[in-house]
Every structure is written in C-alpha cells, then in structure tokens.
C-alpha cells in the first residue's frame, strides 16, 4: 500500500537530505559532502538525491545555506543594539569556528560568475539576516534607541560590511571581538 501522504514523505526526505548536506558541509567542507555521504547520513539512496537536485553542488549548497542560516538566535526582549551585536557576532563565530568561513569565501567568489550561487547566497543567507536586522533597526528607531532619521538600508550595509571585508580579504583577523568593536562604533553613530 502506498504512502497516504506522499507530500509529507517528500518534505521529510528533503529535510533529512538538507540536514545531512548542511552538517557535512559544516563538518568538512564540500569535500565531505559527497553524494554517497549525504545519502548515507540522510538514509536515502543516491537516486533519490538526483531526483530532487541536479548535482552534488546544488544539494550541498542548499544544505549549507539552510544550516548556516539557522546558526543564530537573538536574545529575547533585549535592546535593539544588543540584538544587532549578537546577530553579527553569530555570523563571525560561524565563519571563524567552523569550515563556513572558507566555504563562504569560495561561494562568494563563485557567485561572481554563477547566478545560481549568487541567488542562493542572497535568498538563503543575506536576505534573512538583513530582514532581521532591518526589523531591529526599526524597533530601535520606534523606541527612541536610534535616531529617527536613520537610513535603514545604508545602515544594514554598514552593519555587515566590516565582517565580509575581513572575511574576503583576510588582511586582519576576523574575530568576535572585532565584530563587537565594529558594531559598538556603528551604534554610537546610530544614537546621534
């Protein structure tokens, strides 16, 4: 007898595969995220993987983006400045304490010539973080924590740019302390 809920089964399989791919990418990078390893960890066949994803790169990228995007949480009922600091520090920890840093550098480089990767980075990594940060900025403006004339879009770029600058160029150490210092300098300007 067939599964009475095939859509649920499909969602469960996709979830298991993406979880496995994300874990493998964070544990050992793209080299660890082979189709065999993903299938074994997810408990599915390689054929099932190819049913939903055209390549190892596609499933690994989607799994990594999903895992990386869920790697942060914010303090509850905290001032906007504190939550913004935690958001940026969480990204720095991910980049410096897991293989995500070198992976993200490679993905950003590849995104310059591969639209699929650029879209995945924007949709699954940047936009979710920017949306959370934008809401925090708006809350800070509404509560009087930040200046009323704040340009949210420009501030979002200022918030994250120092992290990506150090991640991509490596001219100085990227560390949680650097992120905290950078954010605190920015917050001083936001308060006016």
Feature map (PLM): residue ranges:
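Basic, helix-initiating cap at the start of DNA-binding domains
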Residues: 1-41, 58
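Short amphipathic alpha-helical segment with a characteristic S/N-K-E followed by hydrophobic residues
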Residues: 17, 32, 55-60, 70-71, ...
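Short hydrophobic/aromatic patch on the recognition helix
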Residues: 43-53
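Tryptophan-centric aromatic hotspots in well-structured domains and transmembrane helices
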Residues: 52-53, 121, 125, 164-165
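Hydrophobic alpha-helical connector segments
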Residues: 62, 72-104, 155
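Amphipathic alpha-helical segments used for helix-helix packing
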Residues: 63-64, 96-120
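Amphipathic alpha-helical packing segments from all-alpha helical-bundle domains
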Residues: 102, 116-142
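Hydrophobic alpha-helical segments that form the core
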Residues: 138, 147-169, 179-186
